Amino acid sequence: GLIVVDRAVHGKNQNYLTPENRVPEKPLPYPWESCIIAGGGWSYSFDAKYMSGREAIHTLVDIVAKGGNLLLNVAPSPEGEWDEGAYKLLNEIGNWMSVNKEAIYGTRSMAPFKFDNVCVTAKPDGSVYLTYLVEKGQTSLPTEIVFPDFKPKKSVKAQLLGTKQKLKWTQKEDGMVIQLPNDMSVKLLDTEAFVIKIK
């Protein structure tokens, strides 16, 4: 088959849109992929400054929660090598994905997409993922996360990905209230983002 992309304007004769170096504020009603420069430019730049792993992970999660794909450009040198900054960035992304890829691969957007510091994704099997974006320098976490207007079955469980930690939750009028354990806060603050799986 043939896939057609117009880099400038969405239209009836193309398959998906490619916002360049930006992320739409809300989900788009057609397939899309944000094309983001990791550092320097589209081609190799000497002494390029690369985005942090945290910035790249937050960008990825935000895009996926809005139903898009991320194309992250990492340009090689004339010798076909990457800078140390590029390797560091990709290693940080890889380490995070090794724990939390379940919240990214094979997921779809789900309203409200994002609330506070939390992005929402879901899978066809009913799994819902809340990814809390930890900001640089953040020193504390909320004691609870309120998933607005969400009313799960009483039998569902909430669990932190990468751990066996089950989280207590209650149902209130404004949504599902998930408790964050105090004894996990130091570990969670040391990550770029952590994921709560609801199923």
Model feature map: region roles:
Residues 1-199:
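Mature catalytic domains of secreted/periplasmic carbohydrate-active enzymes
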